[in-house]
Amino acid sequence: MYGTITEKTNTVATVYDYKKDIRLSVQLIRWMMEMIGTWPKSTMTSSIERYAYTLLNVICIALISFLVVPAIIYIVLEMDNGYLILKLSGALSFCVLAIVKYFSLIFHKEDIRNGIKYIESDWINTRYYSDRITMIRSAKFGQHLVAICMFFMYGGAVFFYLALPFSASKITEDEGNLTYQPLVYPVARVIIDVRHSPVREIFFWMQCLSGFLAHSITASGCSLAAVFAMHAYGRMEILIQWIEHLIDGRKDLCDNMNERLAIIIEHHVRILR
């Protein structure tokens, strides 16, 4: 149970573990964003940790570029079938957008950090029992949305990068002397010939890693929006409860109606930020 109370009849939560509540709100999205190096670090982070985080960002961008650049060169130099070009362009556009989203997450780290601070502050300052229940319900629903997003994104990645290549028919060339399975993202032969082993296997697993990274970036962006939206929704529900008690008051609210109205307006402005 979140928010331990001293008496069941007491509606004001006097003893609670707000850190546990904060983890409930952000634990999944934090795990996912730390994995790709976009979770905002504390201002007290050491220089070594910052350099390590920057290195992780460079590696992630390089891995996604590993999918895009060879495939674009392949389209320009070796493809002449309009349908196949259009088909491959759809997959490439997903990777290009993943790079754009990744840079967006990096450049907006300060905004994300401020959003997380708002969540932490709201949990710390929420003491009324019914308000905390509303917050917990919204946080749990937000985590369910994150889990659903992760399921579909990673499920699609498994199908596209693992199931689809293994189910595809093998290609036979050189009068039957060479047989191989095509990669999800073709590589121009001017770069390297991936038809032979073990080059093909290396590129296959590198593409799988890069693909899962691209899906992680997309899932992180969607999940972050879900977490913030559900937190704001929970605060709006609390605001509605405060408005309902504007006239008659409540144990945790001010005795003066004008002061209660001022608090409600201030809280509403805070939500809109």
Describe each model-derived feature in a short phrase.
Residues 2, 11, 94, 103-111:
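Membrane-cytosol interface segments
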Residues 89, 109, 113-116, 155, ...:
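Generic preference for well-ordered alpha-helical elements
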Residues 256-273:
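Intracellular effector-coupling site of seven-transmembrane GPCRs
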Residues 98-109, 218-232:
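Alpha-helical transmembrane segments
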Residues 67, 95-99:
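Central hydrophobic cores of alpha-helical transmembrane segments in multi-pass inner-membrane proteins
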Residues 109, 115-134:
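Internal catalytic or translocation cores that form aromatic/hydrophobic pockets or channels
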Residues 5-88, 125-229, 241-255, 259:
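Helix-loop-helix junctions within predominantly alpha-helical proteins
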